[in-house]
Amino acid sequence: MAPPAYAAINKLCNDLLQRDFPVGATLLSVRTTAPNGVVFNVSGNQDAKGVISGKLETSFNDKANGLTISQGWTTANVLESKVGLSEQFAPGLHLNVNTTFSPATAAKTAILNLEHQHPLIHTHASVNALERKFLGDFTVGHEGFLAGAEFGYDVQKGNVSNYAATIGYLASPLSVALQASNNLSVFRASYYHRVSSDVEAGGNVTWDAASTANAITLELASKYALDKDTFVKGKINSAGVATLSYFQTVRPGVTVGLGLQLDTQRLGQPAHKAGLSLAFSA
């Protein structure tokens, strides 16, 4: 089995800290699958100011030929297209092209991604064809121990735009990582622990060496499955902001989520947020 992609080394911790917290917005998602495998996905978001944004996306996956195609259209009038090929040119090689186009402004992007997976190394390269920028990363792994690096290069300016490095350990039920990002100026240590089949815990500590405040930020989170259809999550950071969420599958294909964010340093002020998430699938 190949080591994870560089961007996914901290995935377990990041998902625990960032996903399933619908605060400050109302989220709606409707996903349906046709008999021929075509998937339709409509998603919408209304923020605290009442601004609504959304996207309609259609995708198709031809597993026999390793082909995936998707087309999306957003309420910002942006067309998003993705085409991917897997395992067609070499074992473990994945290729995809992502493009966007705005009919109103003629703004466009075109990004080519190449990814290769090997039992000992996972490599990835991304080329922004229009802006002439390159991003590359790799992860090497052995018996759960991981090491990786990332760097960006601006062809027009002829210089390295950014670089980062990560070391970690990943073996169920534990994951730990130490990352230096933003040109090795921001340091982050994180952990994830599946305590039991029902309980997950994780957190991170971050230090920005370039910041004049010289402060360390801390964030902790946990998830508890009440039953197979219901779970609750909670997190709190060093600024005293606590966030809670509750998700329940009320019936097959229908999931409801509630979120609440409290600023414990300003309990008597209007600094708190609530949110709702509705997801339908068929």
Swiss-Prot record:
Keywords: ATP-binding, Ion transport, Lipid transport, Membrane, Mitochondrion, Mitochondrion outer membrane, Nucleotide-binding, Porin, Transmembrane, Transmembrane beta strand, Transport. InterPro entries: Porin_dom_sf, Porin_Euk, Porin_Euk/Tom40. GO terms for biological process: inorganic anion transmembrane transport; lipid transport; mitochondrial transmembrane transport. Consists mainly of membrane-spanning sided beta-sheets. ATP binds at residues 11, 19. The lineage of its organism: Eukaryota, Fungi, Dikarya, Ascomycota, Taphrinomycotina. The keyword Transmembrane applies. It comes from the Eukaryota. GO terms for cellular component: mitochondrial outer membrane; pore complex. Pfam families: Porin_3. GO terms for molecular function: ATP binding; porin activity; voltage-gated monoatomic anion channel activity. Its main location: mitochondrion. The gene is por1. Non-selective voltage-gated ion channel that mediates the transport of anions and cations through the mitochondrion outer membrane. The channel adopts an open conformation at low or zero membrane potential and a closed conformation at potentials above 30-40 mV. The open state has a weak anion selectivity whereas the closed state is cation-selective. It is found in: Mitochondrion outer membrane. Belongs to the eukaryotic mitochondrial porin family. This is Non-selective voltage-gated ion channel.
